[in-house]
Curated annotation (Swiss-Prot):
Disulfide bond entries: none
Domain of life: Eukaryota
BP-aspect Gene Ontology terms: axon development; positive regulation of synaptic transmission, dopaminergic; positive regulation of transcription by RNA polymerase II; sensory organ development
Domain bHLH: 14-68
Species of origin: Caenorhabditis elegans
Positions of region (Helix-loop-helix motif): 28-68
Consequence of gene loss (knockout): Expression in ventral CEPsh glia is normal in knockout, but significantly reduced on a vab-3(ns157) mutant background. RNAi-mediated knockdown causes egg-laying defects.
Subcellular location: Nucleus
GO cellular component: nucleus
Name of protein: Helix-loop-helix protein 17
Taxonomic lineage of the native organism: Eukaryota, Metazoa, Ecdysozoa, Nematoda, Chromadorea
Gene (name only): hlh-17
């Protein structure tokens, strides 16, 4: 009995061409997505600055997301503190106002 390996399936030129085309499309889509990501993350975009590598792009994006999450958390804490101060001032203001009766 003849053993059929994976390489036999790739022997047909049409199959190999189809696989190659699919891989080229996949890589094109990946590179386009990375270019889109590079366009929105903050880094030097000057003409003399080299394009970021794939890994550098992903790491920079990850760090940017972490920084944004921390900023949101800090702002949320500040908003809570300001709300409490505002409520305290309103209560103080109410307690200092003479009754209208």
């Amino acid at each position: 009995m003849e053993k059929i390996g994976i390489d036999t399936a790739f022997a047909e030129p049409g199959v190999r061409l189809s696989i190659n085309l699919r891989e080229r499309c996949r890589m094109h889509d990946l590179n386009e997505a990375l270019d889109d990501l590079r366009a929105v993350i903050p880094y030097a975009h000057g003409g003399s600055v080299r394009k970021l590598s794939k890994i550098a792009t992903l790491l920079l994006a990850k760090n940017h997301i972490i920084m944004q999450a921390k900023a949101i958390e800090e702002l949320s804490i500040l908003v809570s503190q300001l709300k409490r101060k505002s409520e305290n001032l309103e209560n103080l203001n109410k307690s200092l106002k003479p009754d209208a009766n």
